[in-house]
């Protein structure tokens, strides 16, 4: 239909449980009703849902389990099926089919798998099926987790080619301070560009009971806005919130998309969870930030993590501040050997070479 929009709706644990130990089914029913209403108008809806662990814990009668990754994965394995059944039952009331997509970081940091996931998403949406997305917590370890569903929702929005991303939480939006501790805190209505001051505000506030606080929501907003996607942070309890976002009615905090969004490949580079990170010296910082240069091995001071050639990595300065994301031309072991050396020495050190740069400027997105 003309004017149809694609909206990604992310529902965190605090929204799905209402702050309790169990899923708040009445509230979920209302959110599904709102989604179905917009679906009937021709809009394309994508759900990013938390709650698998909470659903598993509830279904098993709140067992006493050790605080281990295995326990969380056990609960997720039990709860994931319960959660998807709930979404299926509720959407079926409105004659809407859903399709489950379980993702891990590996599905998103590899370009080919990213494109495959995008094709699946588009196939579902083209057939009027609502994708329901969650991280695959039953198998994901720290090494392969995206880490939180806020950032996962930004990546889902990129996959879906979304117009808007709605992050539902237990607060009305982003405030100038934590409203639970500071009665003078004011709601920030509009954001045009995310800066260090805003990051400082978000870093001091938390949201709900899940893994994502306001800081991760700001990270997600940054990724999505750079991809040309408007983002709204709003309360899940706000009456008619989904219709408000679709219609452009002011609600919560709105982050305006960049007027000149990143092209598709660079959206993937910026959005993909980094497989590792490198720290660079001041000379490299100047070359990257002021001259728009590629990163040479000479400027590398340290390498963290194990990654392959062609994976996305984070580039940081000596103070630990993020400078850029980029696709590494060499694997982590090779970069450790090359760190601090001139490009002319690459072949001598490694016995092979893939060119003189560690990360080419064309494969780099400055933060």
UniProtKB/Swiss-Prot annotation:
The keyword Transferase applies. Keywords: Amino-acid biosynthesis, ATP-binding, Cytoplasm, Kinase, Nucleotide-binding, Proline biosynthesis, Transferase. InterPro entries: AceGlu_kinase-like_sf (IPR036393), Asp/Glu/Uridylate_kinase (IPR001048), G5K_ProB (IPR041739), Glu/AcGlu_kinase (IPR001057), Glu_5kinase (IPR011529), Glu_5kinase/COase_Synthase (IPR005715), Glutamate_5-kinase_CS (IPR019797), PUA (IPR002478). It is an enzyme of class 2 (transferase). GO terms for biological process: L-proline biosynthetic process. Gene3D superfamilies: Acetylglutamate kinase-like, PUA domain. Catalyzes the transfer of a phosphate group to glutamate to form L-glutamate 5-phosphate. ATP binds at residues 10, 169-170, 211-217. Transmembrane segments: none annotated. This is Glutamate 5-kinase. Residues 275-353 form the PUA domain. Substrate binds at residues 50, 137, 149. Pathway: Amino-acid biosynthesis; L-proline biosynthesis; L-glutamate 5-semialdehyde from L-glutamate: step 1/2. PANTHER family: GLUTAMATE 5-KINASE, ISOPENTENYL PHOSPHATE KINASE. It comes from the Bacteria. Belongs to the glutamate 5-kinase family. It catalyses: L-glutamate + ATP = L-glutamyl 5-phosphate + ADP. GO terms for cellular component: cytosol. It is found in: Cytoplasm. Its EC number is 2.7.2.11. It comes from Yersinia enterocolitica serotype O:8 / biotype 1B (strain NCTC 13174 / 8081). GO terms for molecular function: ATP binding; glutamate 5-kinase activity; RNA binding.
